[in-house]
């Protein structure tokens, strides 16, 4: 983990010994669960007693979750017909976690039509498809919790070379608030997570690109860490713990909020 050795941290202790929530008897759907933050959410939800339905575009990563007790299936969340079919055959869920995302690097001058459309298809449309398919089941269950992955790079803060990504993630926050207001009387809560820089496979892919410019992977890692006020990158479990809380009854008074978890970036 890319941490600052001078700063004491207890990240490894983020498990049920230090963060106790109860998801027993709750059925939780999670997209992009095969790696990174999605995997951490699935693992933590399983540890909290949930019945986890983990999906991803690829089988890789899902196999370990299956061995831990999750019900797994490959699913293209950009295909509305496949989403409708999946939810028509699934039980009524208590929680929905939309984790899928794609980062385009570039200013608006670097964004072509396909980049723009793909950014919105993966980052926003997929959530629209999933939420629309899931709400009837949530209503039948008397309510539930939806958590959408947004980003600090959104309406929260501007970042260089994130034009398409930031626009799509700002729209996620808007969708989240609309769903929260429209279905509050049905007992459905909807929140968004706006992480800062989290150490995931996706981030390491971006580090590899940066390494070509800076000369080495180590230099790229140091560059990413140097931008963090806490002197380290965030870890997937630090996001998963908040999402697990929001899925649980402990988070029952929270809705319509973009939760910022950024290591002090905009403090």
Per-segment meaning from a language model:
Residues 232-261, 266:
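C-terminal substrate-recognition "lid" of short-chain dehydrogenase/reductases
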Residues 107-108, 115-120, 224:
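Substrate-binding pocket helix/loop in short-chain dehydrogenase/reductase
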Residues 100-104:
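Conserved NAD(P)H cofactor-binding loop of Rossmann-fold oxidoreductase domains
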Residues 34-36:
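Conserved glycine-rich cofactor-binding loop
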Residues 184, 189, 254-256:
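Short, small/polar-rich loop/turn modules that mediate ligand/substrate recognition or access, typified
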Residues 131, 168, 176:
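Active-site helix of classical SDR
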Residues 151:
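Residue(s) in the substrate-gating loop at a strand-loop-helix junction
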